[in-house]
Swiss-Prot record:
Lineage, uppermost ranks: Bacteria, Pseudomonadati, Pseudomonadota, Gammaproteobacteria, Enterobacterales
Name of protein: Thymidine phosphorylase
Oligomeric and partner information: Homodimer.
Gene Ontology biological process terms, A to Z: pyrimidine nucleobase metabolic process; thymidine metabolic process
Pathway(s) where this gene product acts: Pyrimidine metabolism; dTMP biosynthesis via salvage pathway; dTMP from thymine: step 1/2
């Protein structure tokens, strides 16, 4: 038996906590026997004193074990359980292609996703722009879809890592969100509750990233890889670029449209293709569905070329109560904005810099995201045909096409786009889409 205040005191004085002490505290968070003040105090001591790797692993596993941990053994699946998690960005629609692509190659992807947070778009919000799409199937249905289709993308239920929800709510109001051990545990508790064999992390870098600097993004990626492997799940991470909008579009319905076009081969943005393929390659290698990069790429290209990946996406949409002919007739089903009009730069030049975060906030301001949890989303608004770094823009080539609900909203968005995109006399040097791979 432990006392919460003694655990806080021990950490306050700079000592490492035992696995038993950490589990006692986390179970107390779940059971409401530990107060908000005590949660805040421990969070602040961790913020200042950090945690050792064994402490980080214990914290993550205790948070994972505070709720249901999915077990797939009874389904006798003939492939690995694998997933990807992204720290979030703008135009980051990779999940919608990646899940079906990896499933078409023999993996099983029980993806538990989130809503939009701040300037970043949420996978669930994007999927809910599809009429009827059910992000909360019951447990039996979720398992059925995984067995039959190979991939399902659903929302987090209250039974998964419940201690994290309470811990995070306290961190949010006590300036302790940006602590690497606490971020790591929060991300991984939910992901590891999926019962995974392998996990790939997409940690964003740049003006639209969650972490403000390359060094902090790198530190987070290294922490996640170390902790997840310590918890028994094969995990690698990629540091990927978020100095510009990843896809050609940013919003909800507009990104779903681009995801379908990507899967069918109608249009594939080169940077989006690079990042999606790189993440899929990691997933296939980590889960032993491919022995090396070349084999993984060949398999992935094949399921794009032969239509299998698009077919899996269509089956997932239908299984989650969306239209059965969505892939063929997406334009008929996705909502369209009242006003669609291009915005042009005031001068000619090359796109040299992009405030990706500001562009994400512009989508939120148009109604495409939430400022508070109770807000309703306008799924039709957003940007398409986004200019990329190095593009030459003039009276013919716009900065973006804005999809808005009315003229006022369009004007505000146009102002935001012009302010977020800087031009120069010559094109900047190109930046990589993937900066670094991190493995154990």
């Amino acid at each position: 038996m432990f006392l919460a205040q003694e655990i806080i005191r021990k950490k306050r004085d700079g000592h490492a906590l035992s696995d038993e002490e950490i589990r006692f505290f986390i179970n107390g968070i779940r059971d409401n026997t530990i107060s908000e003040g005590q949660i805040a105090a421990l969070a602040m001591t961790i913020f200042f004193h950090d945690m050792t790797m064994p402490e980080r692993v214990s914290l993550t596993m205790a948070m994972r074990d505070s709720g249901t941990v999915l077990d797939w053994k009874s389904l006798h699946l003939n492939g690995p359980i694998v997933d990807k998690h992204s720290t979030g960005g703008v135009g980051d629609v990779t999940s919608l292609m990646l899940g079906p692509m990896v499933a078409a190659c023999g993996g099983y992807i029980p993806m538990i996703s989130g809503r939009g947070l701040g300037h970043t778009g949420g996978t669930l919000d994007k999927l809910e722009s599809i009429p009827g799409f059910d992000i909360f199937p019951d447990d039996n249905r979720f398992r059925e879809i995984i067995k039959d289709v190979g991939v399902a993308i659903i929302g987090q239920t209250s039974s998964l890592a419940p201690a994290d929800k309470r811990f995070y709510a306290t961190r949010d109001i006590t300036a302790t969100v940006d602590s690497i051990p606490l971020i790591t545990a929060s991300i991984l508790a939910k992901k590891l509750a999926e019962g995974l064999d392998a996990l790939v992390m997409d940690v964003k870098v740049g003006s639209g990233a969650f972490m403000p600097t390359y060094e902090l993004s790198e530190a987070l990626a290294e922490a996640i890889v170390g902790v997840a492997n310590g918890a028994g799940v094969r995990t690698t991470a990629l540091l990927t670029d978020m100095n510009q909008v990843l896809a050609s579009s940013a919003g909800n319905a507009v990104e779903v449209r681009e995801a379908v076009q990507f899967l069918t081969g109608e249009y594939r943005n080169p940077r989006l293709f690079d990042v999606t393929m790189a993440l899929c390659v990691e997933m296939l290698i980590s889960s032993k569905l491919a022995k090396d990069d070349a084999e993984a790429r060949a398999k992935l290209q094949a399921v794009l070329d032969n239509g299998k990946a698009a077919e899996v996406f269509g089956r997932m949409v239908a299984a989650q109560k969306g239209p059965t002919d969505f892939v063929e007739n997406y334009a008929k089903y996705l909502p369209t904005a009242m006003l669609t009009k291009a915005v042009y730069a005031d001068t000619e030049g090359f796109v040299s810099e992009m405030d990706t975060r500001a562009l994400g906030m512009a989508v939120v301001a148009m109604g495409g995201g939430r400022r508070q949890a109770s807000d309703t989303i306008d799924y039709s608004v957003g940007f398409t045909d986004m200019a990329r770094l190095g593009d030459q823009v003039d009276g013919q080539r716009p900065l973006a096409v804005i999809h808005a609900k009315d003229e006022n909203s369009w004007q505000e968005a146009a102002k935001a786009v012009k302010a977020a995109i800087k031009l120069a006399d010559k094109a900047p040097e190109s930046t990589p889409t993937v900066y670094r791979r991190i493995s154990e």
